[in-house]
Amino acid sequence: MLFLFQDPLGDAHGLAYLYPQAALCREAGEGYADLTALAGEVREGELVLKLRLARYPNPLGGPLGFSLATALVYLDLVPGGEEALLPGLRTPPGQGWEAAFVVTGFGVERKSPEGKREAVRAWREGEWVVWSPGLPPGEYGSYGAVGLCDPFAPWYLRPVSPEGGAW
């Protein structure tokens, strides 16, 4: 294994944010946007990335076995790069990203800072969502975020609100 970052279970509320209150979300319970691990390993000379969520409810029938969460994984491949992540979030100066991966229960998409998008091969291995980013193994920086899936948002990530709300 190249790396394994683990995150404590049960910290998916960020700055005291509430999960949506729509029936679909209430029935799923909480914890489905709780990232518990991100890992990278080498398989047959190629980098493979993996993430694990606390829970995988799938009321919308996502082929990867979940449908309510979106995870974003940004990789810093070379010096420089795009420093803007999400609104209000930036990388340290000079440590921007060159490849981002949007992970939903409906697939994984690679995005470039210029806006290019392409689907990448993804699958499940037990509790892990696994994908092949098409990169050689290397010493890359990484940034991540997890939130609620919004299929209409540019990064499939629902804007957060301290109030909760239906969606």
Question: What role is predicted for each listed range?
Answer:
Residues 128-135:
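Exposed aromatic-hydrophobic patches
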Residues 2-5, 9, 21-105:
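Surface-exposed, glycine/proline- and aromatic-rich loop segments on solvent-exposed faces
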Residues 95-126:
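Extended, solvent-exposed segments with strong compositional bias
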Residues 1-5, 77-94, 137-167:
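Acidic/polar low-complexity flexible segments
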